[in-house]
């Protein structure tokens, strides 16, 4: 899990640098503030045998961090909410990440 978490963090840092460059600001404008931040690698780790079908493990929530990243899940249910409060299922292709 440490290697996977490290790769996900590197992806976030790279995306933040790319965003800064694209906005015409210093390359480290975001990453300098991300250093030492409260980064959390939090696999749900839920025991699906203990709960009924349809149980929600992580409902609608607000992330407090600058970026959120997800890998492909082994179970269905990852959704995002559009600005007009429409729920949309997320399908992450193999080998890709959702940022």
Question: What is each stretch, according to the model?
Answer:
Residues 1-99:
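Peripheral, non-catalytic segments flanking oxidoreductase cores
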């Amino acid at each position: 899990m440490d290697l996977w978490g490290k790769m996900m963090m590197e992806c976030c840092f790279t995306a933040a640098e790319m965003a800064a460059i694209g906005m015409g600001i210093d390359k480290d404008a975001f990453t300098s503030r991300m250093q030492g931040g409260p980064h959390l690698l939090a696999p749900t780790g839920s025991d699906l045998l203990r709960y009924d079908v349809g149980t929600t493990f992580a409902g609608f929530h607000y992330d407090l961090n600058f970026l959120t990243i997800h890998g492909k899940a082994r179970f269905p249910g990852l959704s995002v909410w559009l600005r007009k409060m429409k729920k949309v299922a997320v399908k992450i292709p193999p080998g890709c990440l959702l940022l």
